[in-house]
């Protein structure tokens, strides 16, 4: 890509798109085209076609997608397949018609079969049945891959498809009903820690009152551990499933780095995985996040809830052969993400505490 090329990042306000935009800006690409959903609805074909005709992007990063965790995929399967099919179809076809030089389509590691051999190599695509919990989303992503390959074969386009592993980082979705496991755990442990702080503060207040009463009655008995404020919190964080599934996690800034690298160095129609090449169990991940957050309570695994795919580790030898490797370790990445999350929580609290001026009410001078 040339530094002054017109580059469109679809989905620039999402986790992946925002990271790609940041990376491009840091690499001195000065002509980015960015549109919010309000400015451009990618599900509306006419709007997308008009946008490509008027803006004439030369390169496209297709990061716009409807994403979510197990609960969201189970609850909204029709939305996941319908919206993703519309977005990718409109963007890919319009990119072809507008003569875009190159397009990068972001897929997902969930495209691989549920019982796929590990690590999952690119050639294992469509070799078995998909994981039922996210099948509609996976099918939509596979359709996007096949569209890129078909357009390359029929029209000679340069559309590449990358398959990232599980992602996390600043700008992630922390909604407990729709988020993925890592951001959900960060929020759960943080809120449990904050709840315990409030409980301890309340207990200290009660203990001080008890001490004053005890002194007034001249009791000589030594204080209990409860009186010294040493009582355990007794709180617990609940996690879906058994904790045994293995997952691989890549910081979104590393993904963005890989995407820009591949846009400049990869030309094959065949998909290419983007990952770290190492995985961790959900229980090990929970222990790591618990330690980083500083939560002192216990962890409970709700075995009545689904685990999802038993293991998801991407084979990354193809990417490594091109000379790319991630730079951010899992601990470092989670620490960075947790700091960002805490800052966002503080910002929201500050905004919620600001006085609101209602209709017909005067602002105090």
Residue ranges of each PLM-predicted region?
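Flexible, glycine-rich beta-alpha linker
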Residues: 111-113, 136, 160-182, 246
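NAD(P)H-binding glycine-rich loop region in Rossmannoid oxidoreductase-like domains
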Residues: 45-85, 97
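Adenosine-cofactor binding site in Rossmann-like domains, unifying the SAM/SAH pocket
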Residues: 25-50
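C-terminal substrate-binding subdomain of Rossmann-fold SDR/epimerase-dehydratase oxidoreductases
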Residues: 10-11, 19-27, 191-198, 205-219, ...
